[in-house]
Protein backbone atom coordinates (compact mmCIF):
# COMPACT_ATOMS: atom_id res chain seq x y z
CA UNK A 1 0.00 0.00 0.00
CA UNK A 2 1.37 3.41 -0.94
CA UNK A 3 2.02 6.01 1.73
CA UNK A 4 1.24 9.70 1.18
CA UNK A 5 4.94 10.51 0.82
CA UNK A 6 5.15 8.32 -2.31
CA UNK A 7 2.78 10.71 -4.07
CA UNK A 8 4.34 13.98 -2.92
CA UNK A 9 5.46 16.70 -5.31
CA UNK A 10 9.14 15.79 -4.89
CA UNK A 11 8.47 12.12 -5.59
CA UNK A 12 6.34 12.88 -8.63
CA UNK A 13 9.02 15.17 -10.07
CA UNK A 14 11.68 12.53 -9.38
CA UNK A 15 9.62 9.98 -11.29
CA UNK A 16 9.12 12.37 -14.19
CA UNK A 17 12.87 12.94 -14.41
CA UNK A 18 13.74 9.24 -14.15
CA UNK A 19 11.30 8.40 -16.94
CA UNK A 20 13.46 10.38 -19.37
CA UNK A 21 16.33 8.08 -20.50
CA UNK A 22 19.07 10.69 -20.30
CA UNK A 23 22.14 8.49 -20.66
CA UNK A 24 25.16 10.78 -20.86
CA UNK A 25 25.44 13.17 -22.65
CA UNK A 26 21.70 13.19 -23.37
CA UNK A 27 19.30 15.35 -21.36
CA UNK A 28 16.04 14.15 -22.93
CA UNK A 29 14.08 17.20 -21.80
CA UNK A 30 14.91 16.98 -18.09
CA UNK A 31 16.24 20.52 -17.98
CA UNK A 32 13.20 21.85 -19.84
CA UNK A 33 11.01 20.25 -17.20
CA UNK A 34 13.02 21.87 -14.41
CA UNK A 35 13.24 25.21 -16.21
CA UNK A 36 9.47 25.42 -16.66
CA UNK A 37 8.91 25.08 -12.93
CA UNK A 38 11.69 27.51 -12.06
CA UNK A 39 10.43 30.11 -14.54
CA UNK A 40 7.04 29.94 -12.84
CA UNK A 41 8.60 31.22 -9.60
CA UNK A 42 10.58 34.04 -11.12
CA UNK A 43 13.81 32.48 -12.37
CA UNK A 44 15.48 33.81 -15.50
CA UNK A 45 16.22 30.80 -17.69
CA UNK A 46 19.38 30.61 -19.78
CA UNK A 47 20.08 27.39 -21.70
CA UNK A 48 23.76 26.92 -22.59
CA UNK A 49 24.38 24.28 -25.26
CA UNK A 50 27.97 23.36 -26.09
CA UNK A 51 28.31 20.76 -28.84
CA UNK A 52 26.53 17.58 -27.62
CA UNK A 53 25.94 18.84 -24.08
CA UNK A 54 22.86 20.57 -22.71
CA UNK A 55 23.35 22.93 -19.78
CA UNK A 56 21.02 25.16 -17.79
CA UNK A 57 21.81 28.35 -15.91
CA UNK A 58 18.77 29.69 -14.06
CA UNK A 59 18.82 32.58 -11.62
CA UNK A 60 16.32 34.37 -9.40
CA UNK A 61 17.62 37.74 -8.26
CA UNK A 62 20.35 40.08 -9.44
CA UNK A 63 22.26 40.79 -6.25
CA UNK A 64 24.74 38.82 -4.20
CA UNK A 65 25.31 36.61 -2.39
CA UNK A 66 24.49 33.88 -4.92
CA UNK A 67 23.43 30.47 -3.66
CA UNK A 68 23.69 27.88 -6.44
CA UNK A 69 22.20 24.40 -6.65
CA UNK A 70 24.47 22.36 -8.94
CA UNK A 71 23.82 18.97 -10.47
CA UNK A 72 23.46 16.82 -13.55
CA UNK A 73 20.62 15.31 -15.53
CA UNK A 74 22.70 12.66 -17.29
CA UNK A 75 22.91 9.12 -15.94
CA UNK A 76 25.22 6.17 -16.54
CA UNK A 77 24.15 3.31 -18.84
CA UNK A 78 21.78 0.77 -17.32
CA UNK A 79 23.95 -2.30 -17.88
CA UNK A 80 22.31 -5.73 -18.19
CA UNK A 81 18.55 -5.15 -18.46
CA UNK A 82 17.88 -8.74 -17.43
CA UNK A 83 19.29 -8.01 -13.99
CA UNK A 84 16.86 -5.15 -13.31
CA UNK A 85 13.80 -6.08 -11.25
CA UNK A 86 11.86 -3.24 -12.89
CA UNK A 87 12.45 -1.30 -16.14
CA UNK A 88 15.14 1.30 -15.33
CA UNK A 89 13.28 4.19 -16.97
CA UNK A 90 9.81 3.23 -15.75
CA UNK A 91 10.08 4.39 -12.12
CA UNK A 92 7.99 2.65 -9.51
CA UNK A 93 7.79 2.89 -5.73
CA UNK A 94 8.21 -0.44 -3.97
CA UNK A 95 8.25 -0.76 -0.18
CA UNK A 96 8.97 2.92 0.20
CA UNK A 97 11.82 3.04 -2.34
CA UNK A 98 11.66 4.64 -5.76
CA UNK A 99 13.45 2.47 -8.32
CA UNK A 100 15.05 3.57 -11.58
CA UNK A 101 18.29 4.69 -13.17
CA UNK A 102 19.25 8.03 -11.68
CA UNK A 103 17.01 7.73 -8.61
CA UNK A 104 19.96 8.38 -6.28
CA UNK A 105 22.45 9.82 -8.77
CA UNK A 106 21.02 12.32 -9.07
CA UNK A 107 17.46 12.92 -10.21
CA UNK A 108 16.11 12.64 -6.69
CA UNK A 109 18.41 15.48 -5.66
CA UNK A 110 17.35 17.58 -8.66
CA UNK A 111 13.70 17.17 -7.76
CA UNK A 112 14.45 18.07 -4.14
CA UNK A 113 16.29 21.20 -5.27
CA UNK A 114 13.40 22.40 -7.44
CA UNK A 115 10.74 21.69 -4.82
CA UNK A 116 12.87 23.28 -2.07
CA UNK A 117 13.22 26.41 -4.21
CA UNK A 118 9.47 26.48 -4.85
CA UNK A 119 8.64 26.18 -1.16
CA UNK A 120 11.30 28.70 -0.15
CA UNK A 121 10.17 31.33 -2.66
CA UNK A 122 6.53 30.85 -1.64
CA UNK A 123 7.45 31.58 1.98
CA UNK A 124 10.20 34.15 1.33
CA UNK A 125 9.43 35.94 -1.95
CA UNK A 126 11.65 38.89 -0.96
CA UNK A 127 14.67 36.86 0.10
CA UNK A 128 18.15 38.33 0.11
CA UNK A 129 20.64 37.74 -2.69
CA UNK A 130 20.02 35.29 -5.53
CA UNK A 131 19.22 31.62 -6.02
CA UNK A 132 20.72 29.88 -9.04
CA UNK A 133 20.71 26.46 -10.70
CA UNK A 134 23.70 25.14 -12.68
CA UNK A 135 22.64 21.88 -14.32
CA UNK A 136 24.51 19.86 -16.96
CA UNK A 137 24.11 16.67 -19.00
CA UNK A 138 27.88 16.03 -19.05
CA UNK A 139 28.88 14.94 -15.54
CA UNK A 140 28.96 11.19 -16.06
CA UNK A 141 30.79 11.56 -19.38
CA UNK A 142 33.98 13.33 -20.46
CA UNK A 143 33.07 16.54 -18.55
CA UNK A 144 34.32 18.73 -21.41
CA UNK A 145 31.25 20.76 -22.36
CA UNK A 146 29.34 20.75 -19.09
CA UNK A 147 29.84 22.57 -15.81
CA UNK A 148 33.35 23.65 -16.73
CA UNK A 149 32.05 25.53 -19.80
CA UNK A 150 29.21 27.15 -17.87
CA UNK A 151 31.63 28.32 -15.19
CA UNK A 152 33.93 29.75 -17.86
CA UNK A 153 30.97 31.66 -19.33
CA UNK A 154 29.97 33.03 -15.93
CA UNK A 155 33.54 34.04 -15.14
CA UNK A 156 33.87 35.86 -18.48
CA UNK A 157 30.93 38.08 -17.59
CA UNK A 158 32.01 38.47 -13.94
CA UNK A 159 29.07 36.54 -12.54
CA UNK A 160 30.15 34.97 -9.27
CA UNK A 161 28.77 32.07 -7.23
CA UNK A 162 29.11 32.56 -3.47
CA UNK A 163 27.91 29.17 -2.26
CA UNK A 164 27.35 26.00 -4.30
CA UNK A 165 25.45 22.97 -3.08
CA UNK A 166 26.07 19.94 -5.31
CA UNK A 167 23.44 17.22 -5.08
CA UNK A 168 25.78 14.25 -5.38
CA UNK A 169 24.73 11.24 -3.26
CA UNK A 170 27.01 11.91 -0.30
CA UNK A 171 25.18 9.96 2.41
CA UNK A 172 26.43 6.54 3.50
CA UNK A 173 23.85 4.91 5.79
CA UNK A 174 21.37 7.64 6.73
CA UNK A 175 20.42 10.78 4.87
CA UNK A 176 22.84 13.51 5.84
CA UNK A 177 25.26 11.35 7.83
CA UNK A 178 28.05 12.45 5.46
CA UNK A 179 28.56 15.58 3.41
CA UNK A 180 31.52 16.26 1.19
CA UNK A 181 33.22 19.54 2.01
CA UNK A 182 36.08 18.95 -0.39
CA UNK A 183 37.58 16.50 -2.84
CA UNK A 184 41.04 15.26 -3.63
CA UNK A 185 42.76 16.33 -6.82
CA UNK A 186 43.01 13.85 -9.68
CA UNK A 187 45.98 13.56 -12.04
CA UNK A 188 46.38 10.83 -14.66
CA UNK A 189 49.61 9.87 -16.40
CA UNK A 190 49.73 7.98 -19.70
CA UNK A 191 53.25 6.58 -19.95
CA UNK A 192 54.84 4.87 -22.96
CA UNK A 193 58.18 3.17 -22.30
CA UNK A 194 60.15 2.47 -25.48
CA UNK A 195 62.22 -0.64 -26.13
CA UNK A 196 63.39 -2.70 -29.08
CA UNK A 197 61.23 -5.58 -30.28
CA UNK A 198 62.94 -8.90 -30.85
CA UNK A 199 62.93 -12.66 -30.41
CA UNK A 200 62.85 -13.92 -26.82
CA UNK A 201 65.65 -16.37 -27.69
CA UNK A 202 67.93 -13.45 -28.59
CA UNK A 203 67.44 -10.92 -25.79
CA UNK A 204 70.83 -9.35 -26.51
CA UNK A 205 69.39 -8.12 -29.81
CA UNK A 206 66.34 -6.53 -28.17
CA UNK A 207 65.53 -4.19 -25.29
CA UNK A 208 62.60 -5.29 -23.13
CA UNK A 209 60.63 -2.22 -21.97
CA UNK A 210 58.74 -4.27 -19.38
CA UNK A 211 61.96 -5.27 -17.67
CA UNK A 212 63.23 -1.70 -17.96
CA UNK A 213 60.10 -0.16 -16.45
CA UNK A 214 59.42 -2.65 -13.66
CA UNK A 215 61.89 -1.22 -11.10
CA UNK A 216 60.67 2.33 -11.73
CA UNK A 217 57.02 1.32 -11.36
CA UNK A 218 57.83 -0.60 -8.19
CA UNK A 219 59.54 2.48 -6.76
CA UNK A 220 56.60 4.71 -7.65
CA UNK A 221 54.19 2.31 -5.96
CA UNK A 222 56.19 2.33 -2.71
CA UNK A 223 56.57 6.08 -2.26
CA UNK A 224 54.82 7.92 0.55
CA UNK A 225 53.92 11.08 -1.35
CA UNK A 226 52.66 12.88 1.74
CA UNK A 227 51.02 12.11 5.07
CA UNK A 228 47.73 13.85 4.33
CA UNK A 229 46.26 16.23 6.88
CA UNK A 230 43.22 16.62 9.10
CA UNK A 231 40.97 16.99 6.06
CA UNK A 232 42.58 14.69 3.46
CA UNK A 233 44.00 11.16 3.50
CA UNK A 234 47.54 10.68 2.15
CA UNK A 235 48.01 11.00 -1.59
CA UNK A 236 47.41 7.72 -3.45
CA UNK A 237 49.29 6.45 -6.53
CA UNK A 238 47.59 3.61 -8.39
CA UNK A 239 48.46 1.86 -11.65
CA UNK A 240 45.16 1.51 -13.49
CA UNK A 241 46.21 -0.19 -16.72
CA UNK A 242 49.34 -1.79 -18.14
CA UNK A 243 49.78 -3.22 -21.62
CA UNK A 244 52.73 -4.57 -23.57
CA UNK A 245 53.50 -7.32 -26.02
CA UNK A 246 52.07 -8.72 -29.22
CA UNK A 247 50.24 -11.63 -27.63
CA UNK A 248 52.91 -14.07 -28.76
CA UNK A 249 55.10 -15.84 -26.22
CA UNK A 250 58.23 -15.63 -28.36
CA UNK A 251 58.31 -11.86 -28.99
CA UNK A 252 59.92 -9.24 -26.76
CA UNK A 253 57.66 -6.17 -27.02
CA UNK A 254 58.81 -2.90 -28.50
CA UNK A 255 56.92 -0.72 -26.05
CA UNK A 256 55.01 -0.75 -22.79
CA UNK A 257 51.99 1.43 -22.04
CA UNK A 258 51.08 2.27 -18.46
CA UNK A 259 48.18 4.37 -17.19
CA UNK A 260 48.32 5.54 -13.59
CA UNK A 261 46.40 7.96 -11.42
CA UNK A 262 47.08 10.15 -8.42
CA UNK A 263 44.36 11.16 -5.96
CA UNK A 264 46.16 13.88 -4.12
CA UNK A 265 45.70 16.05 -1.08
CA UNK A 266 46.33 19.73 -0.54
CA UNK A 267 49.76 18.82 0.86
CA UNK A 268 51.16 18.53 -2.68
CA UNK A 269 50.54 20.04 -6.09
CA UNK A 270 50.21 18.41 -9.48
CA UNK A 271 53.45 20.09 -10.50
CA UNK A 272 55.28 18.53 -7.55
CA UNK A 273 53.96 15.07 -8.36
CA UNK A 274 54.91 15.40 -12.02
CA UNK A 275 58.43 16.51 -11.17
CA UNK A 276 58.95 13.55 -8.82
CA UNK A 277 57.64 11.04 -11.35
CA UNK A 278 59.85 12.40 -14.13
CA UNK A 279 62.85 12.34 -11.80
CA UNK A 280 62.31 8.65 -11.04
CA UNK A 281 61.78 7.71 -14.69
CA UNK A 282 64.95 9.56 -15.66
CA UNK A 283 66.93 8.03 -12.80
CA UNK A 284 66.09 4.58 -14.15
CA UNK A 285 67.34 5.56 -17.60
CA UNK A 286 64.05 4.97 -19.38
CA UNK A 287 63.32 6.09 -22.92
CA UNK A 288 59.73 7.26 -22.61
CA UNK A 289 56.93 9.61 -23.57
CA UNK A 290 54.31 10.73 -21.09
CA UNK A 291 51.07 12.68 -21.36
CA UNK A 292 49.32 14.16 -18.35
CA UNK A 293 45.58 14.64 -17.84
CA UNK A 294 44.53 17.12 -15.17
CA UNK A 295 41.13 15.91 -13.94
CA UNK A 296 40.66 18.42 -11.15
CA UNK A 297 42.38 20.34 -8.37
CA UNK A 298 41.78 19.48 -4.72
CA UNK A 299 39.42 21.81 -2.91
CA UNK A 300 38.23 22.29 0.64
CA UNK A 301 35.37 24.25 2.17
CA UNK A 302 36.29 24.85 5.78
CA UNK A 303 34.33 26.35 8.62
CA UNK A 304 32.12 29.14 7.37
CA UNK A 305 28.57 30.08 6.39
CA UNK A 306 27.86 27.21 3.98
CA UNK A 307 29.24 24.36 6.08
CA UNK A 308 27.66 25.80 9.23
CA UNK A 309 24.26 26.19 7.56
CA UNK A 310 24.44 22.67 6.13
CA UNK A 311 25.37 21.10 9.45
CA UNK A 312 22.61 22.93 11.31
CA UNK A 313 19.96 22.24 8.66
CA UNK A 314 20.68 18.50 8.57
CA UNK A 315 20.42 18.24 12.35
CA UNK A 316 17.25 20.32 12.53
CA UNK A 317 15.50 18.31 9.79
CA UNK A 318 16.83 14.78 10.43
CA UNK A 319 18.36 14.79 13.91
CA UNK A 320 21.63 13.53 12.42
CA UNK A 321 25.04 14.99 13.22
CA UNK A 322 26.77 15.10 9.84
CA UNK A 323 30.38 14.12 9.19
CA UNK A 324 32.18 16.33 6.63
CA UNK A 325 34.55 14.23 4.49
CA UNK A 326 36.77 14.62 1.42
CA UNK A 327 36.96 10.95 0.42
CA UNK A 328 35.62 9.40 -2.76
CA UNK A 329 35.85 10.35 -6.40
CA UNK A 330 35.63 13.68 -8.15
CA UNK A 331 32.52 15.77 -8.80
CA UNK A 332 31.67 18.93 -10.70
CA UNK A 333 32.37 20.84 -7.52
CA UNK A 334 36.00 20.83 -8.68
CA UNK A 335 35.08 23.24 -11.49
CA UNK A 336 33.17 25.63 -9.23
CA UNK A 337 35.54 25.80 -6.25
CA UNK A 338 38.45 27.46 -8.13
CA UNK A 339 36.26 30.53 -8.70
CA UNK A 340 36.34 31.19 -4.96
CA UNK A 341 32.95 29.67 -4.16
CA UNK A 342 32.36 27.58 -1.06
CA UNK A 343 31.21 24.12 -2.19
CA UNK A 344 29.38 21.37 -0.29
CA UNK A 345 27.94 18.09 -1.59
CA UNK A 346 24.76 16.81 0.05
CA UNK A 347 22.53 14.14 -1.41
CA UNK A 348 20.91 10.73 -0.84
CA UNK A 349 22.43 7.46 0.34
CA UNK A 350 24.87 6.20 -2.29
CA UNK A 351 24.58 2.43 -1.74
CA UNK A 352 23.03 1.68 -5.16
CA UNK A 353 24.48 4.37 -7.43
CA UNK A 354 25.68 3.14 -10.85
CA UNK A 355 24.33 -0.34 -10.00
CA UNK A 356 21.44 -2.31 -11.44
CA UNK A 357 18.25 -1.76 -9.43
CA UNK A 358 19.32 1.72 -8.35
CA UNK A 359 16.86 3.11 -5.82
CA UNK A 360 16.36 5.82 -3.22
CA UNK A 361 14.17 5.93 -0.13
CA UNK A 362 11.15 8.10 -0.88
CA UNK A 363 11.02 9.56 2.62
CA UNK A 364 14.68 10.54 2.30
CA UNK A 365 13.82 12.78 -0.64
CA UNK A 366 11.29 14.60 1.52
CA UNK A 367 13.95 15.04 4.20
CA UNK A 368 16.47 16.18 1.59
CA UNK A 369 14.01 18.77 0.31
CA UNK A 370 13.62 20.03 3.86
CA UNK A 371 17.39 20.24 4.31
CA UNK A 372 17.81 22.19 1.08
CA UNK A 373 15.04 24.61 2.02
CA UNK A 374 16.44 25.10 5.51
CA UNK A 375 19.91 25.86 4.11
CA UNK A 376 18.38 28.51 1.86
CA UNK A 377 16.62 30.05 4.84
CA UNK A 378 19.79 30.18 6.90
CA UNK A 379 21.83 31.82 4.15
CA UNK A 380 19.32 34.11 2.42
CA UNK A 381 16.97 35.14 5.23
CA UNK A 382 19.34 36.74 7.75
Swiss-Prot record:
The organism's place on the tree of life at top rank: Bacteria
PROSITE patterns assigned to the protein according to its UniProt record, in alphabetical order: ARGE_DAPE_CPG2_2 (PS00759)
Active site: 74, 139
EC main group: hydrolase
Pathway given in the UniProt record: Amino-acid biosynthesis; L-lysine biosynthesis via DAP pathway; LL-2,6-diaminopimelate from (S)-tetrahydrodipicolinate (succinylase route): step 3/3
Gene3D superfamilies recorded: Zn peptidases
Single annotated GO MF: succinyl-diaminopimelate desuccinylase activity
Residues bound to Zn(2+) 2: 105, 140, 354
InterPro entries documented for this protein: ArgE/DapE_CS (IPR001261), Bact_exopeptidase_dim_dom (IPR036264), DapE_proteobac (IPR005941), Peptidase_M20 (IPR002933), Peptidase_M20_dimer (IPR011650), Peptidase_M20A (IPR050072)
Example GO BP: L-arginine biosynthetic process
Reactions catalysed, as given in the entry: N-succinyl-(2S,6S)-2,6-diaminopimelate + H2O = (2S,6S)-2,6-diaminopimelate + succinate
Record's keyword terms, sorted: Amino-acid biosynthesis, Cobalt, Diaminopimelate biosynthesis, Hydrolase, Lysine biosynthesis, Metal-binding, Zinc
Keyword Metal-binding carried by entry: yes
Co-factor requirement: Zn(2+); Co(2+)
Amino-acid positions noted as binding Zn(2+) 1 in the UniProt annotation, renumbered to this chain: 72, 105, 168
Cofactor note: Binds 2 Zn(2+) or Co(2+) ions per subunit.
Enzyme Commission designation: 3.5.1.18
Coiled coil spans: none
Quaternary organization: Homodimer.
Function: Catalyzes the hydrolysis of N-succinyl-L,L-diaminopimelic acid (SDAP), forming succinate and LL-2,6-diaminopimelate (DAP), an intermediate involved in the bacterial biosynthesis of lysine and meso-diaminopimelic acid, an essential component of bacterial cell walls.
Family (UniProt): Belongs to the peptidase M20A family. DapE subfamily.
This protein's name: Succinyl-diaminopimelate desuccinylase
Source organism (scientific name): Shewanella amazonensis (strain ATCC BAA-1098 / SB2B)
